[in-house]
Amino acid sequence: MPIAFISMYKVILSKQAIKDLEKLKRAGKSYAKKAKELIDIVKDNPWINPPSYEKLVGDLQGFYSRRINDQHRFVYAVLPNDCNFVDEQGIPLQGIVHVLKMWTHYE
């Protein structure tokens, strides 16, 4: 029986993250590619290392960050699946990853 890999988390991009992804595309193909790789990683497991992540403090407490490059960070929060989202096969997801932004460092 083949093993199927199932995305365990639903990824939701904020309006800002969608705009940031467009900026990354215009800034260089490799930036957008890295952002999409990070989306795929957190879709499967937002706690996996590598690439390393950092727990944020202050105004961004409750969020985590991963490096896109020296200047840009992928900032996200992991939320419980209170809405009972399921994947394409009807299997309940573990949670929701809310991507806040992807352009510049923390503000």
Residue ranges and their predicted role:
Residues 40-67:
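A short, surface-exposed loop/turn module that caps and links secondary-structure elements
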